[in-house]
Structures are given as C-alpha cells and as structure tokens.
Amino acid sequence: MTSFVKVPAFFISNQGRAEPCSSADVFRSKRVSAEQWSSTSISSGRQVLADLLKLAFAVIGLLSPVTACGSEPTSAASSQASVKSRPNIVIILADDLGYSDLGCYGSEVATPHLDSLAANGVRFTQFYNTARCWPTRAALLTGYYPQQIHRDALPKLPGGSQGTRQPWAKLLPELLKSAGYHSYHSGKWHVDGPVLASGFEKSLNVRNDGNFFTAAGNLIDDQPVTPAQDESGYYSTIDTIDHAIECLNHHTRSHSDAPFFQYVPFIAPHFPLHALPEDIARYRDRYLEGWDTLRQQRFQRQRDLGLVQTTLSPLEREVGPPYAFPEALKKLGPGEINRPLPWTELTAEQQQFQATKMAIHAAMVDRMDREIGRYLQALRSAEVFDKTLILFASDNGASAEIMVRAGGHDPAAPPGSAKSYLCLGPGFSSAANTPFRRHKTWVHEGGISTPLIAHWPGGITSQGALRHTPTHMIDLVPTILELADVTPPAEFEGQPVPARPGKSIVKAFNEDVGIDRDSLWWLHEGNRAVRVGNWKLVAAKDTPWELYDLTNDRAEQQNLAAELPDRVRELEQVWQKQTDSFEQLAALTQPVRTPGGKKAGKK
C-alpha cells in the first residue's frame, strides 16, 4: 500500500529535493544537426531518428514523499560576472499539438529541427499541462496552478475561470528582472493584462486566431497593428518567428552583456486548420489509410524509441467533441463526422475530407518546425546558441472540437485557405494523442500529456536521453528561477506570498531522477484528476472516479476503482484537500473577469 503524505498548506514553503530513481541505461547519441535532418525524406528521417535514439527505458518507482527543503537566498544585486553566467531562456509553446505529433515522439511529420534539439538534449516522457490553453499559460508563466490565481474555475468559485490574477502572482519576466534579464514575447498571449505591464519589453500579440493569413487584430507592444494593404505573403507562424528574430537582434545590439528570456507561443496547429499550399502539398493523400492505421504506426515508433511502456488505448468510438455545434456540421457538409468511427465504415467522401484535414494539421506542424529552425539559426548567428536553454512543449493535447466561427466556412474554398474553417475532430485528434485516451479539455492522459524537449549545450550533457519522472507546467518557473539564481519575493505589501507548488527539474536535465512532490492535481470544466506516485484517479465531468496504475497503463484501460475502493477514497481525499486549499486561497480576493474573457473561453 502506498503511503500518502499530507498536502501542505498553501503558505508553507515546499521546495522539494530531487532524489535518484531506478537506474537507467541511458544511451548517448552523437550530435546531429538540423541540416542533416533536412537532407532526409520524411520516411527516411524517421528511420534516422530511430537509429540515433536507441534509448533504454528507465523504470520509475513511486515518488518519494516531500521533504522540507529551501534554497539559499540570493541577492538581487548580482555581479556582472554572475549575470553573464546565467543562461538565456527560450520557451517555445505549440497550441493543440498532440503527444505524438513530433518525429521524436513518434510522428511521420517532418520536424527535423525539433528532432535535432531532442537528439542533442533530453525528452521528458511524462510532462503534463492543464488540458486547456489559458490555464496552461497561467501555470507556465507563474508557477501556480491556474485555479490558485483566478485563471480557471473552482467548484465554489466558478467566476474565476478567466479572471485577473492577484497582484502577488507575478509572471516570469517580472521575477527575472532582478537577475538582469531582458524579456520578449512573440505570439499568442491569452493571459490577463497587457503584455508590457507583465515585464516583457517587446511583444507581438497574435490575437486573430480565426485567420492565419492576416495580421488584423494583432498588437505590437500592446498597440493595434495596421495590416499591410497586400497581405498575400502573410502567415502568422512565419510572422511570429520574424518578430522573435527581430527581438533577438535588438537584444544583441542593445544588451549583449545581459541574458534574455524569449517566450514564443505559436497559435499553430490550433484550428482553424490554415496552412500554406506548398506545405499542404507535402502531405496530400498521406492520411488516406485513416486514423486507425496511423495510431498503430505512431505507437510502434513510440515503442521503438522507448517513449512508452503501455498498450495502445482502443478508440472510444462514441466520444466526440467536448461541445456540441450541430449547425457547424451542416455548414461543413457530408464529409464531416463527429465520432472516430472505424475508418472502413466511412464513405469515400468522408475519408477524403478527414484525410485532408489531417494533411493540413501536419502541414501546420511542419511549418512551425521550419520556422523554429530559422530562429535556431538566428541564435547561432548571434553566437548565443550554446548558452541558451530551449524548452519546447504544448499547451494541451490535440483537440476533438468541431466548430465554425470567425469568418465562417466557404465549402467552395480550398481546404486550409483563409475562407475555410476546419477543425481536426475526434478521429485524427485521437491519432495525434497516441497512445492515450481523450483530447484537449479532458484530464485523461490524452488531454494533458505533452512533449517536453530541453536543449542547452552549455548545461545539458545528456544527448538524446529520456526522462521518465512526472513533471508539469508549474515546474518551469521554479526551474528557470534556479538557473537564473533568483529567489522570488517572500512578501507582497506586507503579506506572505503563497509558495509555488511546482518543483525545479534542473537535476533531471542530466540524470533520470525522480522529483519529490505530494501529488499532481487537475480540474477543468468538471474534468478532474490527481496523481500520487504512479496512481492516478481521474473522472470526466459528472462521471464516477476511475483508478489507474500508470506504471504500465498510461493508456488508462484497466480501471481498478471497483477492486481498490480504499485507494480511491485515499486519492479522492488528496484531490479534495488540494481543491479546498486552492478555494481558500482564491477566496481571499474577488476574481475580476478580464475583458474579452467570454469570447476567449472556447479555445
């Protein structure tokens, strides 16, 4: 029987120590450049990846209970030498990217630049998000669960879904200022408050996520953009990296002796499925074999790469989109379906329509990787690549949503063009989330599991290694603060600042170690879960708890709730105590709805 530790009160410091877990035979692959990857075809690139990353499994045991541990305080007045020694930090975030959508996580999609980062860095196999875009961004940039800071709802505080953070819940750029960092934002925001007021010095706020082919609605440094009269060459994924490179060049010219933090959150591959015609052409008809076959193919690659120790979850044929939009189905025509039916039962028209949507999704991921490659080259040209920590992740799992909004959908328009409005849907979303169950908004593994790639030549000596310890978006702020040698303020206006629940994962960069923590906790729109060690209690909205032993069942197939009712009660108490603690903290301040929050809700 696993022993569970008491969930700490929200004002208790709970900085955890990382202890070695079970030994792992970590294969160190040779360094591989993006240029080498680019010279291969999609199919041969996958074989090269499998050959390079012959990685063994690490057998992860139950996490150890938390032990009280605090870091040594550091002075805000750092020496110039100390400032120079701190790494630059780059966080790249995809939007609605599935766990298996990158080549280095099992995909057939060509992602040579991210694959190269993985081959020369480390990949985390059990990294989690919050299941939705805006709660994940709050967790990533503050180090708190979003429910603690009015950025997602609680049972007794439903008004906190997209409220204004408490003033003590500072974002990462504000915390890094004391260490001499300059911070820049390029891409989606979806956080409360103006960007520049949050510590960023320059910003491109890509707000018009209803059309990838126009800059209308975007903000530069919190001011509206005037779109060019001719936007025929505009595509938001390219524009995001154009701005990121401009910020990097500005920093190199103006602050070359200081470290920088760049936050690059793409909109891609979020719906609407919009991609450049030449990118779509690379994947045209690639997916006519269907989602059932694609899941099997990706799962086999994941097994070959040592990423998973689970079975492949069967498709849940009756689980469709999380929200019903019957009018959208009428507008989209007979090719659209809202269930992941057996591929052989679809009509030829439906198969072509669905395969085309997946081709556009793949094209969006492909283009994102190409633009990341352009940014990586800019880092090399600025001679800062080796001293820059790059973290790549996704805000939630792939989306099963089907809807039509913004400018609507023209059935006569080429799929993927500005006048089309397509969503991936539950069939190929299930393939993108291979090998897990469910999708974005759910807190089963498919909704909350994301790749995490960490690359830092100056600090990560492992090459191509896997990290098996469960980690979460809330861990990134403590990790970065440790590397920057920053101790966050203990007080705000004379009151104690609540301890961040996340843990630094710095030690895991070079060792496959466990991270001490009580639990990991989830709640979104009634979907709820808690993980303690390898035990996970999870339930969809208005359904009973399910219990899984994730040691060999991350596919969440063997529900043990009926067999182990005591375990269910024990884990439910952990979940409830954490929930009560968050409600007590959040209730101290009144959540204020942010402007535009209602519109932003369904993302």
Residue ranges and their predicted role:
Residues 4, 10-11, 27, 57:
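Aromatic (phenylalanine/tyrosine) cluster motif
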Residues 52-66:
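Bacterial N-terminal signal peptides
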Residues 61-63, 69-541, 545, 552-573, ...:
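Formylglycine-dependent sulfatase
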Residues 17, 28-31, 46:
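Basic polycationic patches enriched in arginine
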